[in-house]
Amino acid sequence: MSRIGKVPVSVPGGVHVRVSSGVVEVEGPKGVLSCAFLPVVTVRVEQEYVIVARCDDSKRARACHGLYRKLLSNMVVGVSEGFSKTLVITGIGYRAEVQGRVLVMALGYSNDFTVLIPSGIEVRVESSTRVIVSGVSKERVGEFAAQLRRLRLPEAYKGKGIRYDYETIVRKVGKSGVK
């Protein structure tokens, strides 16, 4: 039995879970998320818990059991609290600003990067070097934050680039020079 899959998902107040023909819809104060599940698992709602159980003991069902339970848990947390990732921009002249639904980033190239902010994602710039990406869907928030990070990956010699707030960059020692 999947150790993650057998734990029921707790549903907080204000969040409603609906299951209909393989599609689970979770609605809360921050928004609505839905996900289609394969018929190898069954999802049922009991009072303030959602229980994910597998239909048989096939390899596919065992693989999907914990996955679908965690996806459902992320949906419940997303519509009740939301998810966010913080990016830190390091480098001389590197900065970011939001103009409407566009994020403009100066990252040391001759032209600035303009990135369209997708729907369902909110971007705040606390200081010109700190960008907070937030939203309801954990997958979409992480995907957009990774897309921004790829614009200028942190380099190991000076540490310049875009990194996650929790990330530490292992610095390399440069050339020692002639003695």
Swiss-Prot record:
Gene3D superfamilies named among the record's database cross-references: Ribosomal protein L6, alpha-beta domain
Keyword set, alphabetical order: Ribonucleoprotein, Ribosomal protein, RNA-binding, rRNA-binding
GO cellular component: ribonucleoprotein complex; ribosome
Family matches, as InterPro entries: Ribosomal_uL6-like, Ribosomal_uL6-like_a/b-dom_sf, Ribosomal_uL6_a/b-dom, Ribosomal_uL6_bac-type, Ribosomal_uL6_CS
Any single biological process term in GO: cytoplasmic translation
Recorded GO MF terms: rRNA binding; structural constituent of ribosome
This protein's record includes keyword RNA-binding: yes
Complex formation: Part of the 50S ribosomal subunit.
Family: Belongs to the universal ribosomal protein uL6 family.
Function of the protein: This protein binds to the 23S rRNA, and is important in its secondary structure. It is located near the subunit interface in the base of the L7/L12 stalk, and near the tRNA binding site of the peptidyltransferase center.
Protein's recorded name: Large ribosomal subunit protein uL6
Native organism: Treponema pallidum (strain Nichols)
